[in-house]
Design a protein with these regions (language model features):
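Boundary/linker segments flanking structured domains
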Residues: 2-133
């Protein structure tokens, strides 16, 4: 997503190749910082489209493929929230995949343990059903 587009801006003006490269690099960094994932186990496919189509494409992909990180393990795309928001609960992503330095400073633990989150992921992958909260 182009900068500003999630807040109602058009995100126009930035080179789309630079924006995409930066975002994919951020994602690679998030994976690389974990203590229990290896970046070489991941592959990436992407399609460059006009900014107007990004939200529609993203929504269709999420609805079609129902990826676990959108349904159960939220927090992969998060950035450092800064000191003012460190009292918030640690994301499921950072609970299951610890290691991002800024996330280690988050004060409140997730209400679920890494083991509980992992069990829900296995259940979802085996059954296609999102566990009840």
């Amino acid at each position: 997503m182009p900068a500003g587009s999630r807040k109602g801006g058009y995100g126009l003006g930035a080179d789309p190749g630079d924006v995409l490269h930066r975002r994919l690099s951020e994602h690679a960094g998030s994976i690389d910082e974990t203590r229990n994932l290896d970046l070489v186990d991941f592959k990436c496919r992407f399609l460059i489209v006009d900014d107007i189509w990004i939200p529609l494409g993203e929504a269709l992909l999420i609805e079609t493929f129902r990826p676990v990180w959108n349904l159960l393990v939220d927090g992969f795309g998060h950035h450092d929230q800064g000191k003012a928001r460190r009292g918030q609960m640690k994301s499921s992503w950072d609970t299951l995949h610890p290691g991002r330095p800024w996330a280690e400073k988050v004060e409140r633990r997730n209400v679920k343990s890494a083991e509980e989150i992992a069990k829900e992921v296995v259940t979802y992958l085996e059954t296609g059903m999102v566990p009840q909260k």
